[in-house]
Amino acid sequence: MPSVGRVVATLAVVAGITACQPHPVATAPLPVSPATSSAAAPTASALQMLLVITDDWDAVPGVMRRFERDGVRSVWRPVGSDIAVVVGGAGLGWGDGLHGTGSPNEPGPIKQEGDNRSPAGVFRLTSAFGYAPRDSMSWITMPYAQATDAYKCVDDAASIHYNQMLFRQPGSAVDWRSAEDMHRRDSLYRMGVVVEHNANGQRVGAGSCIFLHIWPGAAGNTSGCTAFSSDAMNALLAWLKPESLPILVQLPRSEYDRLRALWGLPAITHSDRP
């Protein structure tokens, strides 16, 4: 998805992404194609990985681990300790990412707009955002956008700007009924990372505006994002490097077990799991 600003009418579009708040639901059925053999190793080019495992498709709590490697043929090694996370209130559903579109030839829920599921699969982590100005966040090496009051993420599937992040210029006309305010009145988006699910909104109604962000607490949930503590977010943003092509791998335990070898995922022990 594009991460460089461009002007569309009177709107400055910053990035195409995927939403973490309730939003309009697509009314037409979504075409879904199984992932093909080209997606057999969706982790192949990454040198940094976030691995999120939940108990099952409907579970909300999960565990996130960081991994890194020196080269694409090197062994993944763990970084830091386990991080408790929460996902969507309805659990996980197959998303659109590096693994392909929808399910890799297996049953399981399919992520759709407004279903309160976080996307399962493999996804690029493309950029960061937060309330603070860029010059005060020099320790973050990922592309970074300050979330001002003008910064929006369009989650209306009927909009031509669906699943895009943009700065809305004062007085500009809009073609959407729903968009997320990226500068919230709480701390949930104080720092966050964009997850490239359904890049550029190419599949209308497949889900939008998916982020890693600060959680409301261990007993909470999201509307489709993955959330964790502020301290963990600080550590993550200091660690992520764009040149390492970082990815998020997010799966229920059964799918991790089935896909670990095929996707080249690091081995974890039962003690590492939720």
Q: Could you describe each region identified by the protein language model?
A:
Residues 225:
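Short cysteine clusters
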Residues 1-9:
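Bacterial N-terminal signal peptides that target proteins for export
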Residues 21-23:
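Bacterial signal peptide processing site
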Residues 30-222, 232-274:
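Cell wall/extracellular polymer interaction/catalysis modules
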Residues 17-19:
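C-terminal motif of bacterial Sec signal peptides marking the signal peptidase cleavage site
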Residues 229:
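Conserved "landmark" site that anchors the functional core of diverse proteins
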